[in-house]
Amino acid sequence: MLGVTMGDANGVGPEILVRAYAEGAMEDAFVVYGDRAVLEYAVERLGLSPSLASRIPLVDQGLLRRPDITPGEMSTAVGAAAADYVVAATHDALAKKLDAIVTLPMNKEATRASRPDFSGHTELIAEVCGNPPVTMMLASDQLIVTHVSTHVALSRAIELATTERILEVIRLTHDAVRRLRPQARIAVAGINPHAGEHGAFGAEDDTQIRPAVEQARREGMDVSGPEPGDTVFYNTVRRNRFDAVVCMYHDQGHIPMKTLDFDGGVNATLGLPIIRTSVDHGTAYDIAYEGNANIRSFLLAMEMATRLSGRQE
């Protein structure tokens, strides 16, 4: 059973959910964590059969009513509810009531009103799970990337790129890629221009990244690096030298992924005691409930959750 959190009620999450269900595209057993009022609103707004809302399996959180829904607008009440959906689904996954959870987008600013330290789904779910070491993975047909750090300032990202953390992410990446691809050839991107060029542009590549790569090789992993950041994605996507890239910071991985396949990327959190995948896009307030949101990333996230949880036959 997959648990689906409906995300921010003023964004595209509920629309994507009900449209995917209406189109018969949700093949896996699932249950939604959210509010009945939001489902009913989405069905009505999209001109779908009124009975559809009652047919969608739901763990009704009872947090939002119809007047709370203001499409395209940021709402602190809606942001708080979206976080609570995620927490509820995570607890049920930890209790083995769910095989995996699939999350639809939240708005960080809307959620921070009730959770001042909120920085994203990844960190919230990790907190509920006891804060194990985790990494964000983005995956599409063309590219898989993971991140040593994500939602922090670039100056802080450089500080976080320690040998221990990089090795941790390499291990998590290797384990996940083995379940998704025939091979697990991992490239580790450098942090400085030209991977430091032997210290000419910074020492971190040689003093922090290279030792992690060497240790991963000793553990039997097929790992290369530090690879220059300006060529590693070309060598991965065009030359098929690697199956995944470990990136040192948020934009290093997100820019190539979203350039290659904005609608077809899937986000997964590696290192949790549960399986969690997500769409690789935001709330898109500007098109909420207009019937134009792309459901592809959501369906791929459902598919990946099934594969990672071992439920696929």
What is each stretch, according to the model?
Residues 109-113, 133-136, 144-147, 154-156, ...:
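Short, well-ordered, mixed-charge alpha-helical segments that flank or form enzyme active sites
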Residues 127-143, 270-286:
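Short, flexible loop segments at boundaries between secondary-structure elements
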Residues 53, 138-160, 164-167:
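Ligand-binding beta-strand-loop-alpha-helix segment within the catalytic cores
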Residues 1-121, 164-248, 252-266, 272-275, ...:
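Contiguous, glycine/small-aliphatic-enriched amphipathic segments in soluble metabolic enzymes
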